[in-house]
Amino acid sequence: MGDVEKGKKIFSMKCGTCHTVEEGGKHKTGPNLHGLFGRKTGQAVGYSYTAANKNKGIIWGDDTLMEYLENPKKYIPGTKMVFTGLKSKKERTDLIAYLKEATAK
């Protein structure tokens, strides 16, 4: 189980420039992540995704995010996300714990 507070710090430092998490939050360079868990790739309403993201067809959850966040461009070739990934499994676990909580509120 990840540490939500550590995950929040990771999000703030590495993700918050491009993403929001709150319900009704604006899309930035990347989509708002509210409702992420259980949603198919490329489905946030009002955000312009690449065909690669739309066509990946997986459902976001702990396992898919764990793999994606390690190396986004390897997991979804053609994604426009510029983030190179979190190599530390602990950091990914903490970030996922935060995202699970923050995107469900």
From Swiss-Prot:
Coiled coil: none annotated. This is Cytochrome c. Belongs to the cytochrome c family. Its main location: mitochondrion. InterPro entries: Cyt_c-like_dom (IPR009056), Cyt_c-like_dom_sf (IPR036909), Cyt_c_1A/1B (IPR002327). GO terms for cellular component: mitochondrial intermembrane space. GO terms for molecular function: electron transfer activity; heme binding; metal ion binding. It comes from Crotalus adamanteus (Eastern diamondback rattlesnake). Electron carrier protein. The oxidized form of the cytochrome c heme group can accept an electron from the heme group of the cytochrome c1 subunit of cytochrome reductase. Cytochrome c then transfers this electron to the cytochrome oxidase complex, the final protein carrier in the mitochondrial electron-transport chain. Keywords: Acetylation, Electron transport, Heme, Iron, Metal-binding, Mitochondrion, Respiratory chain, Transport.
